[in-house]
Amino acid sequence: MNSFPWLTIFVGLPISAGFLIFVFPHRGNKVIRWYTIFICVLELLLMTYAFSYYFQLDDPLIQLTESYKWINFFDFYWRLGIDGLSLGPILLTGFITTLATLAARPITRDSRLFHFLMLAMYSGQIGLFSSQNLLLFFIMWELELIPVYLLLAMWGGKQRLYSATKFILYTAGSSVFLLMGALGIAFYASNEPTFNFETSANQSYPVTLEILFYIGFLIAFAVKSPIIPLHTWLPDTHGEAHYSTCMLLAGILLKMGAYGLVRINMELLSHAHSIFSSWLIIVGAIQIIYAASTSSGQKNLKKRIAYSSVSHMGFTIIGICSISDMGLNGAILQIISHGFIGAALFFLSGTSYDRIRLVYLDEMGGMATLMPKIFMMFSILSLASLALPGMSGFFAELVVFFGIITAKKYFLMPKILITFVTAVGTILTPIYLLSMLRQMFYGYKLFNARNSYFFDSGPRELFVSIAILLPVISIGIYPDFVFSLSVDKVEAILSNYFYS
């Protein structure tokens, strides 16, 4: 048990500081923005300090644990803790949220509410990744919905209410299955419910019941990841959301679903995961091909990047369901890698829209000459997205490939077939990304526009872009930085699988 409540502070600080925003004057947009950035940076620095000094990389057990009695009526504890699986997503959350807050500079309408919602999301995300209690996990999962819905409905495009409603219907509807699964596990074979992850991991269930639990959790996580065919909310949401919200959606929110698949479906329900993993690998391979092909046909820039996110999450699904050391480590690396790259692409698409007020690719052309800095950053990060060697995406996808090839669960021919289909997906990725760059940056369409003079990237845009690019290159050169966080935890998870 940790003597100092680091994790409780990390969960409570952003939302508590967010409430103070409403004390600020209505017209203090600049003060509110810098106050929010200060809180985000302070949180990130505190997390970096605490994890550097108190987290042991070679210990696969839960660390920095905190457990406080919350509700006596049914023995509910505020139970937090982190391990190698949650450490990476927590640091990613702090990094991306800080940059998304800095990216939200153009927001002036209802600035106090906007920045409060950003901080509320921050707390919910940290709480979810550090939760060691099923009911607390569900509460943090739900805490995300209201801020995201309001951010979509109030700061977005013309169809923002439609996309926000679609988002809430999908995510809130699927959350019912998450709650049912959590309650089922808690009340099984006991008059006194226990939501503790550790207790649930050591519990055995009848096969049929475990499959039902697995399906319930899978539906909830498949919507958030997303996994086809439960992905249709994502392109509409990204297409209408402000780009700072898109950064949080692509960088963190989608990763919550993949994290839940590992933390609950794979770790708590290992027998059911063994049964479903073969089918989910097929779904993951189809998802890579389908989303990449669909992305090529999108005329809306943000929707093209959104389908790119769906395609890349297919690699995460394959890695998780390979039930191999390399595959699961590759999936975790892909979660971190795509968190950076996806957030960067949506940020750059938003800054481009701020300048040219165009979102359809067939209306663009010639941005390379008018805005060379944006062209340079967009090109580099697009190459990172298509897994260029030396970038983080390359090692993530490569390790997932090795993971499925070396998986002991599957026969040789299915592994070769899945690898071949997945490889086709990697060929489709440069097709839609390079086509996107050609339509945006080459040609002469913008030269003929009435206001043909456009401002290039400023210091703020360059800082955010470079800040995201640096970890993408660093992980691409030295991926052991991420692997060192997760390798011991992955071995502990796979010890439940006899063919691992």
Curated annotation (Swiss-Prot):
The chain crosses the membrane at residues 4-24, 35-55, 84-104, 113-133, 134-154, 167-187, 211-231, 242-262, 272-292, 305-325, 330-350, 386-406, 416-436, 463-483. GO terms for cellular component: chloroplast thylakoid membrane. GO terms for biological process: aerobic respiration; ATP synthesis coupled electron transport; electron transport coupled proton transport. It is an enzyme of class 7 (translocase). It is a multi-pass membrane protein. InterPro entries: NADH_Q_OxRdtase_chain4 (IPR022997), NADH_Q_OxRdtase_chainM/4 (IPR010227), NADH_UbQ_OxRdtase (IPR003918), ND/Mrp_TM (IPR001750). Its EC number is 7.1.1.-. It catalyses: a plastoquinone + NADH + (n+1) H(+)(in) = a plastoquinol + NAD(+) + n H(+)(out); a plastoquinone + NADPH + (n+1) H(+)(in) = a plastoquinol + NADP(+) + n H(+)(out). One of its GO terms (molecular function) is NADH dehydrogenase (ubiquinone) activity. Belongs to the complex I subunit 4 family. This is NAD(P)H-quinone oxidoreductase chain 4, chloroplastic.
